């Protein structure tokens, strides 16, 4: 068993869990609520760094079914959405301002893409919507309703993305590991898509270009 935990509602911990799943590690879990919940519950902390014997894990098979790529998955979905024929649910989990193109990155982070906006056909369900105020995951019923209200009920193929794939890993974890939906995480995310030449982009704020 491998348990990941971290800050910011486990967003980077979820990315680690997604990577481990991709490379075939068995029984990968997230600590519900992460470090913040652990501290609030008064659980013990230490500064000691543990040591372990060297393991012998070897990657036997890469799970390509949980990773979306630009050419094979994302661009076809975007072009289909432009034509009104989308059969894949794209979920942009960034903030509403990032999604609409009002800002190029979340506060405190440098955007690496030259354009702002979102992928055509993508709906916006910010990653923080998956958790309660204490950072723990919402109930299965609440999560199903959250996504059903956006037209996602598990009957479609789903692709999640954010800026670099870490926040979207949390949504991937929720949809895949908690709800059991068929979902891929696009780890290239907006950093790759927003820098790609000739791809369709939706920008609701009129601020498409971040650099000349």
Question: Which residue ranges define each predicted feature?
Answer:
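Positively charged, proline/Ser/Thr-rich regional signature most characteristic
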Residues: 78-154, 195, 206
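Thiolate-centered catalytic microenvironments shared by cysteine-dependent enzyme domains
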Residues: 1-85, 102-103, 117, 167-189
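C-terminal soluble interaction/assembly domains
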Residues: 145, 155-206
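Short, well-ordered beta-to-alpha junction loops that form the rim of enzyme active sites
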Residues: 7, 92-95, 163
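A polyampholytic, Gly/Pro-enriched intrinsically disordered region
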Residues: 45-57, 142-147, 203-212
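Structural signal for conserved beta-strand scaffold positions within catalytic alpha/beta enzyme cores
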Residues: 30, 47, 92, 124-126, ...
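Extended, charge-rich low-complexity interaction segments
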Residues: 60-68, 148-149, 155-158
């Amino acid at each position: 068993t491998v348990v990941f935990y971290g800050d910011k509602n486990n967003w980077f911990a979820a990315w680690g869990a997604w990577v481990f799943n991709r490379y075939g590690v068995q029984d990968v879990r997230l600590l519900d609520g992460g470090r913040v919940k652990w501290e609030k519950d008064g659980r013990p902390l230490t500064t000691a760094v543990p040591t372990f014997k060297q393991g012998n894990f070897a990657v036997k098979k890469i799970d390509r079914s949980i990773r979306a790529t630009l050419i094979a998955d994302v661009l076809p979905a975007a072009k289909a959405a432009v034509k009104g024929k989308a059969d894949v649910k794209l979920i942009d989990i960034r903030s509403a301002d990032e999604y609409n193109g009002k800002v190029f990155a979340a506060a405190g982070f440098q955007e690496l893409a030259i354009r702002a906006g979102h992928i055509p056909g993508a709906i916006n369900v910010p990653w923080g919507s998956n958790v309660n105020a204490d950072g723990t995951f919402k109930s299965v019923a609440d999560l199903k309703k959250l996504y059903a209200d956006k037209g996602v009920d598990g009957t479609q193929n789903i692709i999640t993305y954010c800026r670099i794939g870490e926040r979207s890993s949390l949504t991937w974890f929720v949809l895949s590991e908690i709800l059991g939906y068929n979902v891929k995480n696009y780890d290239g995310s907006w950093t790759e898509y927003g820098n790609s030449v000739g791809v369709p982009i939706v920008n609701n704020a009129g601020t498409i270009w971040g650099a000349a």
